Amino acid sequence: MYGSARTISNLEGSPSRSPRLPRSPRLGHRRTSSGGGGGTGKTLSMENIQSLNAAYATSGPMYLSDHEGVASTTYPKGTMTLGRATNRAVYGGRVTAMGSSPNIASAGLSHTDVLSYTDQHGGLSGSSHHHHHQVPSMLRQVRDSTMLDLQAQLKELQRENDLLRKELDIKDSKLGSSMNSIKTFWSPELKKERVLRKEEAARMSVLKEQMRVSHEENQHLQLTIQALQDELRTQRDLNHLLQQESGNRGAEHFTIELTEENFRRLQAEHDRQAKELFLLRKTLEEMELRIETQKQTLNARDESIKKLLEMLQSKGLPSKSLEDDNERTRRMAEAESQVSHLEVILDQKEKENIHLREELHRRSQLQPEPAKTKALQTVIEMKDTKIASLERNIRDLEDEVQMLKANGVLNTEDREEEIKQIEVYKSHSKFMKTKIDQLKQELSKKESELLALQTKLETLSNQNSDCKQHIEVLKESLTAKEQRAAILQTEVDALRLRLEEKESFLNKKTKQLQDLTEEKGTLAGEIRDMKDMLEVKERKINVLQKKIENLQEQLRDKDKQLTNLKDRVKSLQTDSSNTDTALATLEEALSEKERIIERLKEQRERDDRERLEEIESFRKENKDLKEKVNALQAELTEKESSLIDLKEHASSLASAGLKRDSKLKSLEIAIEQKKEECNKLEAQLKKAHNIEDDSRMNPEFADRLKQLDKEASYYRDECGKAQAEVDRLLEILKEVENEKNDKDKKIAELESLTLRHMKDQNKKVANLKYNQQLEKKKNAQLLEEVRRREDSMVDNSQHLQIEELMNALEKTRQELDATKARLASTQQSLAEKEAHLANLRIERRKQLEEILEMKQEALLAAISEKDANIALLELSASKKKKTQEEVMALKREKDRLVHQLKQQTQNRMKLMADNYDEDHHHYHHHHHHHHHRSPGRSQHSNHRPSPDQDDEEGIWA
């Protein structure tokens, strides 16, 4: 029971123990260690009883009810098929694997109730002293007579065996000498002789094996007889002790008078013993027949050996194949007959087991004595061992039959001889086995009462020890589960710390990115303003240079006119006498010219004032427009930074959602494990409650069961807490998802607003350009008018204007040099900022890749846990709907996780491709940075994360 070590403790004063019986050479080696028994005297070890039953396949006692008659000794054949050992588990389903004794199979007979005087109402232990002394004396006489007959038969068998062995050795020596002569004299035919030698050696090895087996059987029988004698001695002592104790018990507790029921029992016992004597005589006759058949087989072997020797001497090979076929068919028939006989025996043994278990159940209900149930349990174990040995023997014989069939032994011509030999072998094996079974049945009958009284005690003690072991195993499993939960909690805490560190690091980096983008935007705006100012200054310088060139040309023309006038004056002075009137006219013309010059100067001053006023108004308008552009750019940068902040916040929310999802999944897995553990603990508690019903008298069981109840309630509370934590995290996750959706909406609105602002700004810039072009046209027209007016100006005014223009040119050149220096310094700082920004982008990519790797690892861990749960449920081999549904649900979750893992890998590949494209675009943009630069748009394109990246940050497996 329960796989624990057992002993059968005797009553007080047991003087001897049964010796350990030798095992058959083909037996398995199961050894059960004998633990401490329950009595105060010496113990009869269970190991001896099991070895006795397993070695010799003893048929145990059969139990009938009170009103059953004596069953017949003829039985139907079993329906066992070849190639398969049927383990029929009846009334408890217990089949112990024991060894099988060679060529010994016991035929179990379902005859009378052997424990007829130890039956329902206390057996013979409470009857009068007359029955105690009369029945054992009859049993002893029958036992002694059968033992003497068996010893005589064994001695005869040993003598015959020795004679046969001597004859075999002589024939072996003759065969060896003939083979040596063949080697020396017939060398040309050595090949044929070698073949013959091999075949003869194989046959001889088979014959030797058969002889060895028969010799071992004889030795085995002798040893069994010795062991049975020792067991008989111990049985006598035990019977004597039982009689004394039952007499004392009858005097103290109760006295049962001789009734009709007891008389019937004694009469049935007498009839049974008469039948046993008849069966023993029958077995003796069968043994004699078997000895005769063995002699016949040995004679046939001698004849075959003689024929072989004659064949070797005459160098011929006649009828060799026929003899081989005959011998093989004989062996085949023997094996098949033995298999069929063992099948019949196995069916009978199973019937006996069923009957014994029913009897044990009935007795345990009627007589709650622990020793009797223990004895019945040991008898059942003996029967199981015998069944196992018979099944092993059947397997061996079936293997032999299959080997012979594979070698092609069975021929259709020799079918009749095979049938005859099979029948002969069946009769011999039946006779021998029935005889051995009868002897063993006697022993088991005599021991059954003691065994029945002792096995119940031992089963209860074994149940107690097994319950203790079971409780210890439950405690160990609980401690292991607690340790595992603690380890998982520490891992979860470590992952939380790591994720918090990553979040803080990401927040720092995002802040640095925001600061750098703001600085970059301001620097880009300043650079753009500087460039615009430089362009304006260059245009002014070009206009002034053109004015200077025009004025120089006008000066040259005026110089030429002056020289012409001087020449004319000189010519006029020479002609002064003739031209006084002309001088007067010239003076008048000069005065008119002076008046015209003064008028032109006044008009020029007025035009200059108007032009300066227009220039100042244009400058004011330019300043206003620049301030508006700067304000719009500042708004743009603020909105872009807020966009980036919102996206970073969305990514942080997504990462937080990922963490919560992972925590949720880990908690769900832990909850499932806890539920499974709770179910297991509840099942174990049910088992423990069942055990408690059987053993309420033991206070230790109650304490341990209370502890188990407390632990189960503690685990239920933990499961409830974990479920509440999961619900709370689910609510938090829903809130985070709602916040994320709100942020996404805000981001979309801000993006639409930024697009509108960009469009408005582009329109304003286009209007500004158009206004500047109009101003340029107006300035060009004014310059042309000034040129026209300056043509008529005096040389002094032209020189002054040239000097003023030269001074203005030098000032503009100095301003241009200063702006160039400022531009170089700002470009250098911008390059440094861009390098820092590139480093920050690389770090952000690395962090995103690490996050994706963590997601993939979490998914892989979840998939492996699902696989482990599926494997556990499939290994449990319970075909319940609930377990199948759980397996299907786990498989669906696993498929979903695999799909999410694929999505994560695709997102990671997209991220890598986007990073590569972004790096390439950034390099190209940096290469053409000095030629074409739009800071607002470039900033937007560089710092806005890709939609794939956003999706990837929002995905959680």
Curated annotation (Swiss-Prot):
GO terms for biological process: regulation of calcium-dependent activation of synaptic vesicle fusion; regulation of presynaptic cytosolic calcium ion concentration; synaptic vesicle priming. It is found in: Cytoplasm; Synapse; Presynaptic active zone; Cytoplasm, Cytoskeleton. The keyword Coiled coil applies. GO terms for molecular function: structural constituent of presynaptic active zone. InterPro entries: ELKS/CAST. The keyword Chloroplast does not apply. GO terms for cellular component: cytoskeleton; GABA-ergic synapse; glutamatergic synapse; growth cone; presynaptic active zone cytoplasmic component; presynaptic membrane; synapse. It holds the Pfam family Cast. The modification Phosphoserine is found at residues 65, 666. It comes from the Eukaryota. Residues 14-25 have a biased composition (Low complexity). PANTHER family: ELKS/RAB6-INTERACTING/CAST PROTEIN, ERC PROTEIN 2. Thought to be involved in the organization of the cytomatrix at the nerve terminals active zone (CAZ) which regulates neurotransmitter release. Seems to act together with BSN. May recruit liprin-alpha proteins to the CAZ. Interacts with BSN, ERC1, PPFIA1, PPFIA2, PPFIA3 and PPFIA4. Interacts through its C-terminus with the PDZ domain of RIMS1. Part of a complex consisting of ERC2, RIMS1 and UNC13A. This is ERC protein 2. The gene is Erc2.
